[in-house]
Amino acid sequence: LAVSACGEKAETPETPAATEATASETGLPEIVVSDEELAGNPFRQEWTADYGVPPFAEIDDGHYMPATKKAILELRADIDAIVDNPDAPTFENTIVAIDVAGGSLNKVLNVFGNITNTDTNDTLSELEAEIWPMLTREMNAINFNQDLFERVKTVYSQRDRLGLDEQDARLLELVHREFVRNGADLSPEVKTKVAAINEELSGLTTKFGRNLLLSTKAFKIEVTD
């Protein structure tokens, strides 16, 4: 889901000037990213190098936030499409759809996470403080989406008669377990508390990682003959 999936993404509504999702539509903060911001962004292009290696030489710090915003909008559209599907929940239209949702977000975060963990700078540190809490809010919204979880539960309740092979059965088990462990079955009041804890942990984890990296970079050992 999202940060660990890959696949074709649903198109999000666009205007010539910008792509956006409003808070009233999603219950989440509004996100707007312009076509101009995305122009020439390597994360919006197909990577043709062997093994899909990212074009690191073409990526600069200014590419991360626009690409992240666009990918989040695509993730929201993917989730909305699953929830709004008028057909009865099935393994394909619910479990597989969740598994491949938000693949473009994974593309950005794989690079961003590795770079910020190994070769960060002040600009990237500021981006971390914005991007990770933003993603935590998105994941909270997905994990606590009751309509989405009801579809997952429906498929899971039918697992013994779906005729799934070992791999698909494992995927169904993992998706259902992930929702449960992230609090999908909790009461609304407890979900609110968990969401707040998740956001606090996101900020603290980012801060700890940044301090650890700075400490590692500052370390030195003197060797004398």
Label every model-predicted segment.
Residues 2-5:
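C-terminal motif of bacterial Sec signal peptides marking the signal peptidase cleavage site
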Residues 8-225:
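Zn2+-dependent metallopeptidase catalytic domains
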